[in-house]
């Protein structure tokens, strides 16, 4: 059942007034594939625009806080924690992990996904002058804790 549709099929914001306030946490990831030379430039701190990881981290945190402004029908949330981590993976990839937390009436999956996505977009923006062939991939929810639907953890396919 799609909870964002009413009985006539019209979109509406889900009413969470009567839902219990519980601890909720979500973790999402994204990857940015690039030329090895681009990744080396980022890791060595030689990018002319500055510290790519630091800017992408701040962009991801800001994006989590602005999710309800970007995603229609998403509730504005009082996040109590947002952590965005970036690391080199192999010789041609940046791995991004975003974790959001709160005590509230609705989940934080969209905030974690938005944080990871915007961090990836920021890397693309900062590096596009040297590598227009970058690919943003594997934007996905890794884990969700709390709420009525309980615990979800991505199971890797063998």
Curated annotation (Swiss-Prot):
Q: Which GO terms describe its molecular function?
A: cyclic pyranopterin monophosphate synthase activity
Q: Where is the active site?
A: 125
Pathway of action: Cofactor biosynthesis; molybdopterin biosynthesis
| Biological-process GO terms, alphabetical | Mo-molybdopterin cofactor biosynthetic process
Q: Which superkingdom does the taxonomy of this entry point to?
A: Bacteria
Which gene does this sequence derive from?
moaC
What are the binding positions for substrate in this chain?
A: 73-75, 110-111
HAMAP family given for it? Answer: MoaC_B
Q: What does this protein do?
A: Catalyzes the conversion of (8S)-3',8-cyclo-7,8-dihydroguanosine 5'-triphosphate to cyclic pyranopterin monophosphate (cPMP).
Please state what class of enzyme this protein is: lyase
Record protein name field: Cyclic pyranopterin monophosphate synthase
Per the record, the similarity remark reads: Belongs to the MoaC family.
